[in-house]
A protein has these predicted regions:
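Crotonase-fold acyl-CoA enzyme core
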Residues: 2-89
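C-terminal alpha-helix plus adjacent terminal tail
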Residues: 49-56, 72, 76, 80-134
Length: 134
């Protein structure tokens, strides 16, 4: 969701970041989530790895842009949205995407965070937790 430009979702959507519960953290996706919802909402997700957040929470915090009641409305809303977007100037859409994703530091931080995740993944305590999940 955090890597999407625009999200239309069902009211049934539930999300959580469970990484902390398995001995690592959401380091690989942290920058994308922070960019989308900010530090406070990211902290709420990351420090509560067993707690599901509702579609209302996602909407209030900017993770999704529109919530619909049922699958029929979801399909209708998606068709309407894509029907509009497809008629926009391609160059304008391309430049908009470029501007929205212009934060160059994200790539570097994601690489650094990948190293953190790798170190944590090989720790005995993390391995023990992961083996229990298997």
């Amino acid at each position: 969701l955090a890597a999407s430009d625009y999200v239309i979702a069902s009211h049934k959507v539930l999300i959580k970041l469970s990484e902390l519960a398995i001995g690592i953290g959401p380091f690989l996706i942290e920058q994308l989530i922070r960019r989308k919802i900010g530090v406070s909402a990211l902290s709420s997700l990351a420090y509560n790895p067993k707690k599901w957040k509702s579609s209302d929470w996602c909407l209030e915090n900017g993770l999704i842009n529109d919530v619909v009641d049922n699958e029929k409305k979801l399909n209708l809303t998606l068709n309407e949205f894509t029907g509009e977007v497809i008629n926009y100037q391609l160059e304008s859409l391309t430049m908009l995407k470029k501007v929205l994703w212009s934060d160059k530091k994200i790539d570097n931080v994601i690489l650094e965070n990948a190293e953190i995740s790798a170190r944590l993944l090989i720790m005995p305590k993390t391995q023990k937790i992961l083996n229990k999940i298997k």
